[in-house]
């Protein structure tokens, strides 16, 4: 499946455009930072953080734009084979629906690794030219970017299984991503609903990682979302291979969704959340004195 992706001109188009725009963004950012650094007399304490981390860092711009590329990548993973009829060959082979889905998903995130080479190369270059480069938070930010790519790929794969039209699959993926971005604003007047919609929202899930902080809640969110949409896709292919009533399909989808929400709700309780600040100066952590005051 990964080899088939590279036979597609769309995959090469994505790789070339992403590499060009990302490199141009990094070059422009570095130029501005070097200028500001010279004007300030070289007094900035953490150039690695300024260049790569935070809302205005290089990796934040990559995170903001990655949603454009993934739907184009995933739109044909299943819909192309469904439209051509070649999916029936997979159905007749001695492989399960889960194995088919897993193979296509691994191909998608494998291509995501190719995309990751561009920001990784930028980070390596930064480590060579920036004194006392703080690798740990930058690696966490890169992890956040890759987890986001994995989530987008799982969503796109599911949408590709719903239609034979690649454009419809791409548009559907963008719609799902838009819903997940804005769902956090629903039900704000009710505590329980607010907590559920807040957890379901993908908006801001990488903010802490882009600052070098790993939160268990965010990592679990990405794992649950990926698992949920891969389960959806597997069930969709299974229902295509054998007759399953629409009522049973609806109940199954609802059951998967409720289970995911339950996991997310309980793992996002304050007592369940673990936080790891990887910055060298523990910039995002409270001091020990502050923690003792809050404990009282």
Where in the sequence are the language-model features?
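Secretory targeting signals
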Residues: 23-27, 45-61, 102-166, 225
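Terminal transmembrane helical anchor/hairpin motif
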Residues: 29-53, 162, 169-236, 240-241
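Long, hydrophobic alpha-helical segments
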Residues: 17, 54-80, 115
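Alpha-helical transmembrane segments and their helix-start/interface "positive-inside/aromatic belt" motifs
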Residues: 1-19, 165-174, 248-255
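Transmembrane helix boundary and interhelical loop/hinge segments in multi-pass membrane proteins
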Residues: 71-91, 105
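Hydrophobic alpha-helical transmembrane segments of multi-pass membrane transport/permease proteins
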Residues: 9-33, 61-69, 175-179
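Internal/C-terminal transmembrane anchor helices
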Residues: 245-270
């Amino acid at each position: 499946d990964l080899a088939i992706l590279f036979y597609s001109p769309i995959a090469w188009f994505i790789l070339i455009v992403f590499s060009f725009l990302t490199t141009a963004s990094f070059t422009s950012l570095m130029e501005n930072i070097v200028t500001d650094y010279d004007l300030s007399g070289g007094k900035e304490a953490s150039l690695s953080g300024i260049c790569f981390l935070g809302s205005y860092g290089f990796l934040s711009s990559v995170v903001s734009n990655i949603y454009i590329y993934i739907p184009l990548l995933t739109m044909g993973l299943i819909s192309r084979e469904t439209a051509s009829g070649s999916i029936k060959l997979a159905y007749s082979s001695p492989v399960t629906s889960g194995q088919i889905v897993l193979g296509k998903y691994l191909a998608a995130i494998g291509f995501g690794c190719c995309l990751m080479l561009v920001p990784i190369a930028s980070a390596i270059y930064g480590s060579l030219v920036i004194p006392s480069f703080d690798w740990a938070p930058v690696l966490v930010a890169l992890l956040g970017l890759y987890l986001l790519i994995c989530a987008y790929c799982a969503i796109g794969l599911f949408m590709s299984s719903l239609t034979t039209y690649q454009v419809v699959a791409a548009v559907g993926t963008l719609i799902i991503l838009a819903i997940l971005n804005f769902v956090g604003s629903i039900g704000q007047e009710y505590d329980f609903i607010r907590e559920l919609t807040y957890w379901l929202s993908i908006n801001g899930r990488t903010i802490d990682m882009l600052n070098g902080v790993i939160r268990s809640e965010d990592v679990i969110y990405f794992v649950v979302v990926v698992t949920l949409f891969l389960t959806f896709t597997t069930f969709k292919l299974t229902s295509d291979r054998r007759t399953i009533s629409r009522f049973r399909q609806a109940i199954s989808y609802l059951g998967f969704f409720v289970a995911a929400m339950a996991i997310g709700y309980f793992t996002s309780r304050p007592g369940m959340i673990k936080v790891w600040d990887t910055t060298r100066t523990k910039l995002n952590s409270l001091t020990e004195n502050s923690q003792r005051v809050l404990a009282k």
